[in-house]
């Protein structure tokens, strides 16, 4: 969302402010469908026995219950403060500061983790307590530029979750979170679209889906052999560029 808000500062979408606020959230459903596509086998809680009889996968059901627990803190904070955040913090400067701050956090935490062995190696090792703690970190993502996935991954790394398990649980969390946020934004917008607005939403979702398929596959392959420091440096550089631009030209 932070990236989209920044792009809108330079190439503004020709639409009402209310529609853009809804659009920046709802098109991320395309990214969520990409997550479901890639992680279908892990996310779908049923499997066929002898190709005819469906059998429940207990580990998958358990992971979804943990996901619900992790979503509770963020849901409460979003309902209480979403309007305030939209009105006061959706600015390029706030986004840039958040980019830099959490970029530094990624680098510091990865350096600290060099001497630590993860306590939680796999997705199924995540407990309800761990899930709730990760959910508390997800609350930070209500600040534009923080990155929901960045906040949850940083939180997971801090409490001893491996990189791969942290990323996978973040993707689990994304499904109910983004569906919930999208529903909230659409209800606030009024569920009334012009044909042009509807077309913009569909195109945005399709593009988000296609790009996300490539990015998620790359990310999961990359973190099996590397840490997150490169993403930290990227955030810092982008944040500095944005601050410099608005200091000089705004």
Residue ranges and their predicted role:
Residues 1-250:
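Multi-pass membrane proteins that catalyze or facilitate reactions on polyprenyl-/lipid-phosphate substrates
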